[in-house]
């Protein structure tokens, strides 16, 4: 009788754990070297932020937009922000300094790789986009659109550390060599 109760309890626990969609479960694994991306950004951060002509304006608005993202929306928001940086920020930014351009290109390539990883996750139906996630991304695009394109690209590049810290906090990151 005790063995049967323990077996039923164990089975029930396993079923609950498998069906729960909480902070640690069913998140997409980002397989990339985040430390390398962060290092690349730190090497150019000062030069990028020195070009920022709107120091009191934010695009990512850390407290208002990214901090309120629910665990269920992390994959979608990450996917959307990677697309935002790849499709808008990196394309809109025109960098004359070859050293900075190489670092930005390296970061962009890493973002493309992360996009590929999240696309696979989405194909497995593990990356849902709820209205809250779409709204958060829209706020960031609206903030970007309020500035002139060049200024918005500089501002967004200067805030890249905010996005990288958010990825580290909200994703299981597996470092690849």
UniProtKB/Swiss-Prot annotation:
Induction: by DNA damage through pathways mediated by JUN and cGAS-STING leading to production of the cytokines IL1, IL6, and IL8.
Keywords: Apoptosis, Cytokine, Disulfide bond, Glycoprotein, Secreted, Signal
Disulfide partners: 28-121, 75-127, 76-129
Subcellular location: Secreted
InterPro entries the UniProt entry points to: 4_helix_cytokine-like_core (IPR009079), IL-10/19/20/24/26 (IPR020443), IL-10_CS (IPR020423), IL-19 (IPR020421)
GO CC terms, sorted: extracellular region; extracellular space
Keyword Glycoprotein: yes
Function recorded in the entry: Cytokine that functions as an anti-inflammatory and proangiogenic factor. Polarizes adaptive immunity to an anti-inflammatory phenotype through induction of T-helper 2 responses by both down-regulation of IFN-gamma and up-regulation of IL4 and IL13. Produced by osteocytes, stimulates granulopoiesis and neutrophil formation. Exerts its biological effect through a receptor complex consisting of a heterodimer of IL20RA and IL20RB. In turn, activates the Janus kinase (JAK) and signal transducer and activator of transcription (STAT) pathway, and importantly, STAT3.
Family listed: Belongs to the IL-10 family.
PANTHER family linked: INTERLEUKIN-19, INTERLEUKIN-19-RELATED
Name under which the protein is recorded: Interleukin-19
Organism: Homo sapiens (Human)
